[in-house]
Amino acid sequence: MKIDIFDTTLRDGFQQEGISPSVKDKLEIAKLLDNLGVSFIEGGWPGASPKEEEFFKKAKSELNLANAKLVSFGSTRKLSLSADKDPQVQALLDADTEYVCIVGKSSKLHITKAIQATVCLLYTSPSPRDLVISRMPSSA
């Protein structure tokens, strides 16, 4: 049995007030996580800040990961924009990572009340690409 570790230190781990690692720090931490054998390293949210964009640019040329795959993190498109017009979706594409983690509203309450959209379930057959979809329930 193989267990894949999906590490969120470079994004979620730095959300505490007063913690703001440099791009160099994030690159070094990514190397350490790779050396530990972590399977996936969530690098951050490209488009959230120029520093995040710089991290992904430098990671492309400076990180030679032996074990891990770098993952960019972002959200679904804004309800009022098509995906090709949404700057967040474009930032995910510009990060040029092999893997992307996309967070989106999945509870009926969030969909109908928070973003005031309708619930639509779409079932698809497996795609020819390796697409993994997992759902983690929110606390609300």
Identify the function of each model-found stretch.
Residues 39-60, 105-115:
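Glycine-rich, proline-tolerant flexible connector loops at the mouths of alpha/beta enzymes
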